[in-house]
């Protein structure tokens, strides 16, 4: 566990491709999708919260503090990241924040360790995950000192692109290996976008999780 690193799970999306609603509450292997994400991320951080809008009571079973966006207009993942940075700065003793999408049940159990190792010795830098040469901007380690710059970027510049904000600052990409799964391999950042993805995740679950 990295006690000086807080974590936030991003679950504020509208899930249009899944017919609306909270896809993180869909059942996977007998428990909510969110439960798998929490089980993998919680042991890696000192404090963990959930970024989601609407009635927080629907996430009560997760045991997490639920943080609504601090900017209006459903501004996407960057709004959740900003909310997480501001929460961590005022409610924890942590120095940085790791973010993860709430629809990725197989996220790396060494996500924080690898991102933190890459960022070590580079004060103020963002460490962002990648796999198979593809960047995953919502899986990143963010210095809390970037929160004012992010609020300006999101609110004053009205720019919602996560990668665009990352590229404006010093950053390092961290390549994560594929996971072994039933004789094959799967991207650890595999996410649930449509019903077929959920069916695939069900088949993969037993071969990936210990």
Named regions from a protein language model:
Residues 192:
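Regulatory input/activation interfaces that engage signals or partners
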Residues 2-159, 167-188, 199-209:
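Nucleotide and nucleotide-moiety/phosphate-recognizing core
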